[in-house]
Amino acid sequence: MANVNGYVDLLEGIPDETKEEMVELNNTLDKLDSCLDALEEQNDSLNAKLRDLLQSSQQARQELQAERQSLETEQNTEPSTKSDQEQKKQ
């Protein structure tokens, strides 16, 4: 049994041209697998970055809402000035 590109040739009687085509196809599939692995890594990396961005955005929004509520609370609890009192009388 001959060793063809790391695989034991169990297919006796297959023409050499066909075996060469099979080896080329196997190499092409290996390259495709490597490319898909690289794409998967990039996808995972982008996904992680997007999750971080989303979390950061949510935190910033919560901080802005808390700040806005704090300002509204301060405005509602401030004593009214004379002009406010005069406007209320009119």
Curated annotation (Swiss-Prot):
<keyword id="KW-0175">Coiled coil</keyword>
<feature type="region of interest" description="Disordered">
    <location>
        <begin position="57"/>
        <end position="90"/>
    </location>
</feature>
<protein>
    <recommendedName>
        <fullName>UPF0184 protein</fullName>
    </recommendedName>
</protein>
<comment type="similarity">
    <text>Belongs to the UPF0184 (EST00098) family.</text>
</comment>
<dbReference type="Pfam" id="PF03670">
    <property type="entry name" value="UPF0184"/>
</dbReference>
<dbReference type="InterPro" id="IPR005374">
    <property type="entry name" value="BBLN_eukaryota"/>
</dbReference>
<feature type="compositionally biased region" description="Basic and acidic residues">
    <location>
        <begin position="81"/>
        <end position="90"/>
    </location>
</feature>
<feature type="coiled-coil region">
    <location>
        <begin position="16"/>
        <end position="78"/>
    </location>
</feature>
